[in-house]
Amino acid sequence: MLNGIIENLIVAVISYSASTLFHNRLRLKIWFQSLLRWNKNIRLSCAYLFKINYNNKYLLIKGKRIDQFQPVGGVYKYYDSFNELKDKMELVDESEMHFHENGDLRLKTKGRHLVRFIDWFDSKQNREVTVIRELIEEMELSEIPVDRLIRKTQIEYLKTIKEPIKFSTHFQMDELKIFNIYKAEIPNDILDEVLKSSHYQLVEANEIERQCLSQNGLDRKISETSKYII
């Protein structure tokens, strides 16, 4: 009987350990990567993107700073209450020449603070948690009344993407990008008005996969991040 209890206990411990490792495998990977980059700079970017469907196609918007079509969305903002913790984690705002606006969660830090930063981001404290701001800003060009857009749109969370840390040739440093993906259900009558503007484009899933759109006889680039809304 005692042997049976011990065996069951061992099995339970092994099962629990295996389950814990499985569910925290990404976290363990990031922890290991942070050790390898302990004193190296890492760029951090935390954003949210919207999956907006219309007749089995996906709505993209023309980039403001890069000549491409990309998902509606943008970067989260942090609040003043984050400043003390920001200093402790040696977080530095990105230069304005790299698309940074005041309060953007586009920062850089040392690898040793990486896990702590992700813990903070996942806690949703000291930062923007609503996602309506970027939807309103991105839809401004369509001249849809804001109150109508807010009242008629249903938004639901789909998933979170934490990209593997990789070297950015543009920023000349390693970077970690985090994307929260949301589905925005916008009535067709509103989308009909939105599509009157050349700033918006409907694309097929295969065009997103190819990162290329044919428009007026020309090939137009589709952002790599668009794949996350398929």
Swiss-Prot record:
What ranges does the record give for the region Required for cell toxicity, renumbered to this chain? Answer: 1-31
UniProt xrefs under Pfam families: Sa_NUDIX (PF18167)
What does this gene product do? Effector protein of a CBASS antivirus system. CBASS (cyclic oligonucleotide-based antiphage signaling system) provides immunity against bacteriophages. The CD-NTase protein synthesizes cyclic nucleotides in response to infection; these serve as specific second messenger signals. The signals activate a diverse range of effectors, leading to bacterial cell death and thus abortive phage infection. Causes cell death in response to 3',3'-cGAMP upon coexpression in E.coli with V.cholerae DncV; inactivating DncV prevents cell death.
**What residues form the membrane-spanning segments?**
none
Question: Which family does the similarity line name?
Answer: Belongs to the CBASS Cap16 membrane effector family.
Q: Which GO terms describe its biological process?
A: defense response to virus
**What name goes with this protein?**
CD-NTase-associated protein 16
Query: Which UniProt key words apply to this protein?
Result: Antiviral defense, Nucleotide-binding
Superkingdom assignment: Bacteria
The domain-related comment in the record is:
Cell toxicity relies on the N-terminal domain; its replacement by a SUMO domain prevents cell death in cells also expressing DncV from V.cholerae.
Q: Which InterPro entries match?
A: Cap16_NUDIX
